[in-house]
């Protein structure tokens, strides 16, 4: 639960992110989705209730301590260093870790290759396309090898082909053992990649289930998707 001035903007929301799964957190503006997401990431402390990660109560922990436990975060806002190269953006994180230079070099090479950034590895952040920037941001979030990554609007501001590439990257992350929570206004693209979705409305979970289940839910269509939403590909 989260209250502001006595008003509950989130009330009784319970979300489970299974190991190696992709979960979507969706809802209209003002529904409580963003507040819920920020309580999970540690930006907002709940008024009541718990945030539990791998059996540990992390409700009161700040973001940096959650990161140490294995929670990565991709901000909606640009977060790369504009005047550093792709490789140096990765090194900026790697150099905060107590690892050898050999490990830093091999980890940077691995991430650059994994996210298809080899051709732009020497380019400064300010010269990257929107899709390249987004891939670098995800690569940076993976530097510390988190077991859970929170993706805030990963499909925002990128072209359809890059969205498909990002969806593929996300699936590969899960195949490697990472769990993912996504919140994004691009409902269709999000539902294409998630295993399970939670629909938040008026601060509560309106519905949960597979993409096909939430799309076929008449209450969800009325409150969130609208009657014009097709969704035939999810049948």
Regions found by a protein language model. Give the residues of each.
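Conserved ABC ATPase signature
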Residues: 124-128, 132
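The feature captures the beta-strand-to-loop junction immediately N-terminal to the Walker
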Residues: 26-28
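Conserved ABC ATPase "signature" region
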Residues: 91, 102-120, 168-171
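Helix-to-loop junction immediately C-terminal to a conserved catalytic motif
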Residues: 41
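Conserved ABC transporter NBD signature motif
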Residues: 49-56, 69, 107
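Catalytic Walker B motif of ABC-type/P-loop ATPase nucleotide-binding domains
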Residues: 149-153
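Conserved catalytic motifs of ABC-family nucleotide-binding domains
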Residues: 145
